[in-house]
């Protein structure tokens, strides 16, 4: 391998000739051979935005020439375009302030500018008015805000739109509800889907609430928050340039001491990501359980068959998209624990868990953005209800007895449900057997009872063709009260007359 000699304050070191990084990047490569997780590309892109904005602000303050600032800006634009991704090889597991990554960006910009005829020093020019202690926290917030606005929110809103279309496609389909994994009262399928939609939309509102804190930047605080070596008004200039480049309302944090030592804004924002992950897991579980089967499960939903599900069981198809969603959700929840603990370690004037916080936050954002789109395209858009199975389960449910509770009371309704379950009959048969509901009305009974119920104001609360009474009745319990017999013209004057008319026999 061809090398060239670079130097820093610790001396000379050999660097691969084909790469544009310098001595400090090379030392980090040799000293931190830990894991394989490189700094997220989102962090490098955020640094490219930040370095360009800082260069332009330094030019406005007279600390750089317009030509120097222009050279830095040109290289930063190429970095954001992804042209030099191979020049940023450092892993997450390095110094907790991210100093090596900051210097990696500085060195690459300086060397690429030198290739274009502009000699720049990584520290004196590219890092002017800056410290790793304020640039890495700022780059972290820039990357986090952009990942939320460009990845998570658009993907989640597309998923919510898919649920809305599913909701509108089946407005009148009734299904049985379930609580505690047991049968419950009925609801519309569209109502259940509206709940899924809101489970996606609510965390989006939480994320928008968290964004204003994420857009506050530590830039201008330099080493410990005092702003040493940074011109007055420099932080406002940098944020103004960033707003123009990204369209995001970045502002300087009013208290730089807080900005350098605390990552509470990151914890708050990731809490909203965790809420989205938890809700996605709930939705995915609902869908895969309701699609279980095809013959021995619930089978109330049909989901797309995307790939074979088993290497040994022919014809088996699994809810793979739902499983991918649940695994991504588990990872996000683990990331949340890491971010929370890292944020608690801001000892004195600087939090030194910045790279791991950045890695976990950006991984969560990337996972959620990708999984929302994958789940929408390969599962949600292809969901159809199994109307036949839904209807059969609806009519077979014992919890329909809840509708009778206002009429016959809670205990009587419970007795009906238990009898139907014990005897293996339908709920209707159990209610009839216990006498809480009569069969179809005959002769004058229908007309008399219709008037009686109408006077009580309860006509519309009964099923068509049936009448209910508050308690178990004797065999003659449907006879009208004595004082009302004369009004009921179609009802016989006594039980014996009723028997004679019914059977045609004498006494």
Where are these regions (language model features)?
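Conserved, well-structured ligand/cofactor-binding cores
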Residues: 1-452, 456
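Aromatic (phenylalanine/tyrosine) cluster motif
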Residues: 443, 449, 466-469, 491, ...
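Tryptophan (W) side chains
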Residues: 448, 495-498
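Short, low-complexity intrinsically disordered segments enriched in A/P/G/S/L with frequent Arg
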Residues: 479-481, 489-490
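Short, intrinsically disordered C-terminal tails of secreted or membrane-associated proteins
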Residues: 500-506
């Amino acid at each position: 391998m061809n090398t060239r000699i670079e130097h820093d304050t610790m001396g000379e070191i050999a660097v691969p000739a084909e790469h544009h990084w310098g001595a400090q990047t090379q030392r980090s490569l040799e000293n931190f051979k830990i894991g394989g997780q490189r700094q997220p590309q989102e962090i490098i892109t955020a640094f490219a935005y930040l370095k360009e904005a800082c260069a332009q602000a330094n030019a406005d303050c007279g600390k750089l020439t317009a030509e120097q600032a222009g050279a830095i800006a040109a290289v930063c634009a190429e970095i954001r375009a992804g042209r030099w991704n191979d020049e940023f090889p450092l892993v997450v597991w390095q110094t907790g302030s991210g100093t090596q990554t900051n210097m990696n960006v500085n060195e690459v910009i300086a060397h690429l500018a030198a290739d274009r005829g502009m000699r720049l020093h990584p520290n004196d020019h590219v890092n002017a008015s800056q410290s790793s202690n304020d640039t890495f926290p700022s780059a972290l917030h820039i990357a986090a805000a952009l990942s939320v606005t460009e990845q998570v929110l658009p993907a989640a809103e597309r998923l919510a739109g898919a649920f809305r279309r599913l909701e509108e496609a089946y407005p009148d389909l009734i299904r049985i509800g379930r609580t505690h994994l047991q049968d419950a009262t009925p609801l519309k399928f569209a109502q259940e889907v509206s709940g899924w939609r809101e489970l996606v939309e609510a965390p989006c509102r939480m994320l928008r609430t968290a964004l204003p804190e994420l857009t506050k930047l530590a830039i201008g605080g330099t080493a410990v928050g005092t702003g040493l070596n940074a011109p007055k008004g420099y932080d406002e200039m940098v944020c103004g340039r960033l707003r123009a480049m990204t369209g995001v309302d970045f502002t300087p944090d009013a208290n730089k001491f807080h900005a350098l030592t605390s990552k509470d804004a990151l914890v708050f924002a990731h809490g909203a990501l965790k809420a989205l992950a938890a809700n996605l897991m709930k939705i995915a579980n609902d869908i895969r359980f309701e699609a279980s089967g095809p013959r021995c499960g619930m089978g109330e939903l049909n989901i797309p068959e995307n790939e074979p599900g088993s290497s040994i069981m022919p014809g088996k198809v699994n809810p793979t998209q739902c499983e991918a969603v649940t695994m991504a959700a588990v990872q996000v929840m683990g990331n949340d624990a890491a971010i929370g603990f890292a944020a608690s370690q801001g000892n004195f004037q600087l939090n030194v868990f910045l790279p791991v916080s950045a890695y976990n936050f950006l991984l969560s954002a990337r996972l959620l953005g990708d999984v929302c789109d994958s789940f929408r395209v390969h599962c949600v858009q292809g969901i159809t209800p199994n109307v036949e199975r839904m209807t059969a389960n609806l009519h077979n449910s014992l919890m329909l007895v809840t509708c009778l509770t206002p009429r016959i009371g809670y205990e009587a309704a419970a007795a009906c449900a238990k009898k139907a379950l014990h005897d293996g009959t339908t709920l209707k048969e159990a209610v009839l057997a216990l006498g809480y509901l009569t069969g179809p009305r005959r002769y004058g009974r229908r007309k008399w009872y219709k008037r009686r119920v109408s006077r009580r104001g309860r006509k519309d609360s009964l099923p068509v063709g049936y009448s209910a009474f508050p308690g178990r009745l004797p065999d003659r319990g449907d006879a009208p009260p004595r004082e009302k017999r004369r009004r009921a013209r179609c009802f016989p004057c006594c039980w014996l007359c009723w028997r004679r008319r019914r059977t045609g026999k004498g006494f």
